[in-house]
Curated annotation (Swiss-Prot):
Keyword Transmembrane: no
Name under which the protein is recorded: Aspartate--tRNA ligase
Organism: Latilactobacillus sakei subsp. sakei (strain 23K)
Subcellular location(s) of the protein: Cytoplasm
Segments for region (Aspartate): 199-202
Gene: aspS
Length: 590
């Protein structure tokens, strides 16, 4: 096999008159008798090959080529005739007149075409993932991911960070999701856990004096899957010592700025906008707001305390909220049926319903209009609602109102075409609550993780009013997605123990699970903090994809299985015996 001169997709006018050797896959063959055209594909794109009757043996061999045959060709690059130029191809101004052809491998009939825009099922594409990855859009998505990691390495290496690996086999600790457990053959009955994050280890590296750490960390969480989640994922993981929260955020911005410059050729302005958690919830109904469009939530609670609309007044006077969004020019676009569908949809957030009115000729119309007649002028003024606008109301508890209106503003903004899809809007959400109440557990849990440092002024609230305490934490948001986040960490043993107790973790439990971390705090643990950026999600957004599976070479499906290798799978009884394990037989359900 000859050495390749260049990639097929890079052959342009600068190669005219040169002899090149190319390797790749046959995308398409077109035969015109004594002339055969072949599109040769590799990761950089396509180039047109020409086989003519100057070499009858090669022409005959070219006639046997089929889609996805792997070939090697050598030939002269020439400019195409003006009429033959293809403006849709990067290499559309040139072609290669082939003088040598070698078939390196053949291909059977394919389960689907190797091209973009196919309608093949996701399961089939995952079963033949190696073929799916040949499609140009998938190649570009994976390449985009590689470019992001290269840019991140570049920034971190140039700014004094040390690339240090942490263990993938560690002990099981509660971090929110279920652990993936690995049985130990050497210690029967004992298990390792795959890390949900390198959190404790990277903090211990700070105690060891490696004040600027990073790695492309592999993380594992046994949780229910959504479109932007996988059981195994990668994060750009960073930890530093002796930095303020603002200085740490500057490092995260530096990584993102480098990535945007190198990968997207966009210079994003820094520092990024900062918004407190409470403001984000009040204005956008979300702790990860998409700020590319307005449709901000407006509070009508005080006004509605005196409303004759009993649903609103009762809600407002019971300590709950009445809030609304105005959809500009939405009155004519949305029918009652369409709005009823959205009313039904937000019930999944706990909402009892959604009221709506339309502004027509300066007056309110619609089902709720008659109940708001007395306050019509005041309401129109407060909302700055104009003719043709649609107003949506939700009255309920804080979280229900936020979740419902947060969803509605995104839904209607996208449906109305109000979102600039070409924009990358970065935002820091800061000043988070330290705890959040988990209805399922019936207790307070850490909003981020139990190592997050409280605001200095809130430490004493750990024992008295934990729900009032705020954290020195920060999330980085991109276009309504949580791209990553971090915090300053607790570095004093007494505060860490108080944090554990506030979470309902007994001294016996936290000593058993985190004794090594607490012990380290007795030996001069420095102030420290850090962050992690989700590489998969970052790549998904920069590649313009809707699912992180598209930027992972070999992902799991929505059932956490992998159709290509049929993982997970049963193992041989001898392997179970060696590990001292016994699998209970499946019981058929009635």
């Amino acid at each position: 096999m000859k050495t390749r001169t260049t990639y097929s997709g890079l052959v342009d006018e600068t190669f005219v008159g040169q002899t090149v050797t190319l390797h790749g896959w046959v995308q398409k063959r077109r035969s015109l008798g004594n002339l055969i055209f072949v599109d040769l594909r590799d990761r950089e794109g396509l180039v047109q090959l020409v086989f003519n009757q100057d070499n009858a043996d090669i022409l005959a061999l070219a006639n046997t080529l089929r889609n996805e045959y792997v070939i090697e060709v050598t030939g002269m690059v020439q400019a195409r005739d003006e009429a033959a130029i293809n403006p849709d191809m990067k290499t559309g101004k040139v072609e290669v007149i082939v003088s040598e052809l070698t078939i390196l491998n053949e291909a059977k009939n394919l389960p689907f075409e190797i091209k973009d825009g196919i309608t093949t099922s996701e399961e089939t594409k995952l079963k033949y993932r190696y073929l799916d990855l040949r499609r140009p859009e998938m190649q570009q998505a994976i390449i985009r991911r590689s470019q992001i990691t290269q840019a991140a390495h570049k920034y971190l290496d140039n700014n004094g960070f040390l690339n240090i690996e942490t263990p993938d086999l560690t002990r099981s600790t509660p971090e929110g999701a279920r652990d993936y457990l690995v049985p130990s053959r050497v210690y029967p009955g004992s298990f390792y856990a795959l890390p949900q994050s390198p959190q404790v280890f990277k903090q211990l590296l700070m105690d060891a004096g490696f004040d600027r750490y990073y790695q492309m960390a592999r993380c594992f969480r046994d949780e229910d899957l959504r479109g932007d989640r996988q059981p195994e994922f990668t994060q750009i993981d960073v930890e530093t010592s002796f930095m303020s929260a603002e200085e740490i955020q500057e490092q995260a911005e530096g990584i993102i700025k480098q990535v945007m410059q190198d990968v997207m050729h966009i210079d994003v302005p820094t520092p990024f906008k900062r918004m407190k958690w409470q403001e984000a919830m009040d204005r956008y109904g979300s702790d990860k707001p998409d700020i590319r469009f307005d449709l901000e939530i407006q509070d009508l609670t005080e006004m509605m305390k005196t409303s004759s609309f009993k649903v609103f007044s009762d809600t407002a006077n019971s300590g709950n909220l009445v809030r609304a969004i105005v959809v500009p020019e939405g009155a004519a676009k949305y029918s009652r049926k369409m709005l009823d569908e959205q009313t039904e949809y937000i019930k999944r957030y706990g909402a009892r319903g959604m009221a709506w009115v339309k502004v027509v000729d300066g007056e309110l119309t619609g089902p709720a209009a008659k109940f708001l007649k007395e306050q019509e002028a005041e309401l129109l003024s407060a909302l700055s609602a104009k003719d043709g606008d649609l107003v949506l109301f939700v009255a309920d508890k804080f979280q229900v109102v936020c979740d419902s209106l947060g969803y509605l503003r995104k839904h209607f903004a996208h449906d109305m075409g109000l979102v600039d899809e070409s924009q990358f809007a970065y935002l820091w959400v800061v000043d988070w609550p330290l705890f959040e109440y988990d209805e399922g557990f019936g207790r307070w849990i850490a909003a981020h993780h139990p190592f997050t440092r409280p605001n200095d002024s809130d430490v004493d609230l750990l024992e008295t009013d934990p729900h009032k305490a705020h954290a020195q934490s920060y999330d980085i948001i991109l276009n309504g997605y949580e791209l990553g986040g971090g915090s300053l960490r607790i570095y004093q043993r007494d505060i860490q123990e108080r944090m554990f107790k506030a979470l309902g973790i007994s001294p016996e439990t936290y000593e058993e699970q985190f004794g090594h971390l607490l012990s380290a705090m007795d030996y001069g643990f420095p102030p420290h903090g850090g962050f992690a950026i989700g590489l998969d999600r970052f790549a998904m957004l920069l590649a313009g994809r809707d699912n992180i599976r598209d930027v992972i070479a070999f992902p799991k499906n929505s059932h956490a299985s992998e159709p290509m290798t049929n993982a997970p799978s049963r193992v041989a009884p001898a392997q179970l015996d060696e590990l001292g394990l016994e699998v209970e037989p499946e019981v058929e359900k009635d």
